[in-house]
Amino acid sequence: MATRLLRTNFIRRSYRLPAFSPVGPPTVTASTAVVPEILSFGQQAPEPPLHHPKPTEQSHDGLDLSDQARLFSSIPTSDLLRSTAVLHAAAIGPMVDLGTWVMSSKLMDASVTRGMVLGLVKSTFYDHFCAGEDADAAAERVRSVYEATGLKGMLVYGVEHADDAVSCDDNMQQFIRTIEAAKSLPTSHFSSVVVKITAICPISLLKRVSDLLRWEYKSPNFKLSWKLKSFPVFSESSPLYHTNSEPEPLTAEEERELEAAHGRIQEICRKCQESNVPLLIDAEDTILQPAIDYMAYSSAIMFNADKDRPIVYNTIQAYLRDAGERLHLAVQNAEKENVPMGFKLVRGAYMSSEASLADSLGCKSPVHDTIQDTHSCYNDCMTFLMEKASNGSGFGVVLATHNADSGRLASRKASDLGIDKQNGKIEFAQLYGMSDALSFGLKRAGFNVSKYMPFGPVATAIPYLLRRAYENRGMMATGAHDRQLMRMELKRRLIAGIA
């Protein structure tokens, strides 16, 4: 019972904003600092200082991240000034903590202060990191970004999770509307839509399904009558400590809920298939990921088969020790079943929560010991997927990274493999409003590059934004190079204007 309560509380904590005392703003000390976590397309652990070539350096990878005048040539000075200010503010840990405290305090209960706070956030962080309040506004933002910069858009309805069937159904309709908005755009303007399974299936059910899948892996004689055909979701090195005893079978009601969840994801996939819009399925932490992988792969088998290119993409988190093994198993099975498969490769999120849960159970963290191990795993997986995509197979690859070294390695690998950078099989992605220098550099090097563009009503998106800011502080701190380039370009324009 104690273990069950522990896990239940862990789930509850993992999907809420950090809790601070309502008495006053948080005090940040070395002992209370949270290990940074990077979510969504920014999913990656904090990066070490990178080597940035001088303007005179020549690199055979074709990726120039040093010439700020060329990188930011498409950005108006007013936008560049605002971006610089917002990114500097987002890199200040105490400011992020204060904003998180304000949004979770009683100040938001008063209409006057709530309106002031929402108005301030909308005109700064929201407008910088979000694409609009609804799918139509987001589609227009995608259009304007592409026309100004040549960067594509990934539309993301910014909802984290749902607790009941009504919310799940409502979220499904929002995802359908997102697909319709993407379809209304020229195909050159967008790359995909993104869905979170936690938004269309209750977290409690995903946990139950994950427990049962783990036990099936541990005990081959343990059969799951409701299970659809899928690819492997575990490898020999996968963490199984979440499930230490045989779980109870799904109740009749839970089976109906699971069938409804399958129906929602299939309806979304069907709409994507009809609209020729790729669907990227986001990853979560390891307590839920087996169920998400299962649903992603079962959907891929249904909707990717007999296609030249995949519709459904699953996400691989390279900061997990078993990422490489699970990726290879999925690819092997996809090839065996002749199913084109898409993969979005990220570094990972939830570092501190993964470590905390493992430690509380007396187990080793599923996350790599060092950041360099994570970088190595990411680059190995990236190389493997690029080789698969280059041999004429139906694999699709989205390299979601803010790491310039990975960008350079991929650029060199593409050249070595003779990959057509514009064939649509390989693309890069970064969060909207972040790592613009890398995005522009990759675009200038000839790659397809997309921005992960969340949208939603301001009040709904604020918790999403705060969680992103809270978890992205580590990456913001290592984004000093981007901010330095922005300052240099602003200074250059100022001097040029005076002269």
Swiss-Prot record:
Locations listed in the record: Mitochondrion
Cofactor names: FAD
Catalytic activity: L-proline + a quinone = (S)-1-pyrroline-5-carboxylate + a quinol + H(+)
GO molecular function: proline dehydrogenase activity
Phenotype of null mutants: No visible phenotype when grown under normal conditions. Proline hypersensitivity.
Gene3D superfamilies xref list: 3.20.20.220
Entry keywords, A to Z: FAD, Flavoprotein, Mitochondrion, Oxidoreductase, Proline metabolism, Stress response, Transit peptide
The name this protein goes by in its record: Proline dehydrogenase 1, mitochondrial
